[in-house]
């Protein structure tokens, strides 16, 4: 695996882990807001909302899977992002765009931009789950530094993108 592939591989894994960790912490800290977002989707009976903690717990477990599987699996991250994308897609198709996505971070209503963002994250899940990563000792430091830098830059871009979406919705009066 070339150095560029290695940097992309670990950078995309790092950004997935950071995004899922951020979303999970946000859901645990703002459980009332998260329960409200789940309630807004209208797909779950009220009694099922007492199990709200399962979603951020699965996100935390997927972070551990990403960090400790070293390229073998991104199954949980792919599964949870696929479910989120399917829920968002379904609600966009039926015209229910006035819902908080419940994604983590600033309150953002459903939009095709959110769906597109999740699609890109799904691509990162696939591209970062290629097995057979071989780390060559003579390039280890440069690859690690590049992967960490790339992952942090992607995470910062993700946060900026979410903030821009939220600001655009406020400015447009949505």
Regions found by a protein language model. Give the residues of each.
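Membrane-interfacial helix-loop segments of redox and metal-homeostasis proteins
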Residues: 1-172
